[in-house]
Amino acid sequence: MTLQEEIIKELGVKPIIDPKEEIRVSVDFLKDYLKKYPFIKSFVLGISGGQDSSLAGRLAQIAIEEMRQETADASYKFVAVRLPFGVQADEEDAQRALAFIKPDVSLAVNIKAAVEGQVAALNEAGVEVSDFNKGNIKARQRMITQYAVAGQYQGAVLGTDHAAENITGFFTKFGDGGADLLPLFRLNKRQGKALLAELGADPAIYEKVPTADLEEGKPGLADEIALGVTYNDIDDYTEGKVISDDAKAKIEAWWNKTQHKRHLPISIFDDFWK
């Protein structure tokens, strides 16, 4: 088995999907979790305005609505959380996403004070924080906030990790990489777009240039520039297609370099890192 085949197997990506079928798979997955753990009464998700959180958010809202209808339990809620750092340049995109998702509850928590406070405390201790590391603090602060909200709403936190992101490790460890459920796992970027189109999303949501937008020195830096490879190549790779040697080498290098992000903390019984 080639490394490409091993990765595809681990990520569970299909070369061809039926968007309607995959929507149902994700919705049922979320509902099954609520049925298994009846004390969980909500799903919580941070909404950025991009493709991934828009899709995960809409799937969660559908699952919650179906649970309310099937159980007659009105306490089930989906909580969408806006988590801007100061003034978000693409706030219009975030509002467009919320209009599409139609969440039961919509909150806005500005993380700037918390992040700047952490950076100031580190500086006071003699630790200089780089722009890159500050970006990771932002991602982790957003997850701290989501878990605080989930604690108040008897909720589980959703993540937006998907195959095209997971394969490159393009997420912050214990930041956006930390969640309870991943309804998009197994889908690559173009497949996520297909699901959004099926759900009737405004094309502006899934045609938006993907960006983590964590570094202040590189505002709005496109994912593809940061990674050095296109999502089209990543999607082709995860679907088992032949891509250029250069793109393949970059993707597999990211996979190997970020392997630690796909595991729980390493114990003496783990050998994947050796």
Swiss-Prot record:
Does Phosphoprotein count among this protein's keywords? Answer: no
Q: Which residues bind ATP?
A: 46-53, 160, 189, 211
Q: Name one Pfam family in it.
A: NAD_synthase
Q: In which pathway does it act?
A: Cofactor biosynthesis; NAD(+) biosynthesis; NAD(+) from deamido-NAD(+) (ammonia route): step 1/1
In the UniProt record, does the keyword NAD occur? yes
Q: What is the similarity comment for this entry? A: Belongs to the NAD synthetase family.
Q: How does it assemble?
A: Homodimer.
Tell me what this protein is called.
Answer: NH(3)-dependent NAD(+) synthetase
Q: Which gene encodes it?
A: nadE
